Amino acid sequence: MKKEYSVYLLLSHSGSMFSRAINFFTDHPYTHVSIALDEDLDQVYSFGRLNPYNPFFAGFVREDIHHGTFSRFPNTTSAIYELKVTGKQYRSIRREIDRFRSDGHKYTYNFLGIITASFNYPIYRKYKYFCSQFVAEVFLNSGIDLSGKHPGLTSPMDILEYEKLELVYSGYLRNYRQAHLKVAVAG
């Protein structure tokens, strides 16, 4: 029997000016998505702010749910989903993320791509991604098509529609670890 692995998708809405603008145009409850390689959310990756106070200085980031941008916005709402994957898919996802990590300084946020996606026009620019484009591409390159769309057209809510996701938490992100510990102790 093949061993199953789990990866986690963290969907969030920080309430920042940028996330409120996205929410205004999309009317979606979640405006950001990240990949977590562990259930404790210690290894979380996405495209977002490199500096919590400057939304325009953005690129590939390892996020910390209790520091940095998320701590600046303590009322960040979130939904955390678990996705079971094969060992081969898990290793591929890790390799994809390692590819981004090894050249992390080259990557910047795809502001133009997020605008063109709203007109159903994907744009590929080397070393430039927005959060859901990054997540969709990492999974697609690992044999998992989360949205059925081109990564450059994928929104966080498109990813949420993937049928194999299992909700493990919904609420304020700042409360996740405490809620997660209670479940782990009770289980």
Which stretches of residues belong to each language-model region?
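Cysteine-nucleophile amide-bond enzymes
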Residues: M1-G187
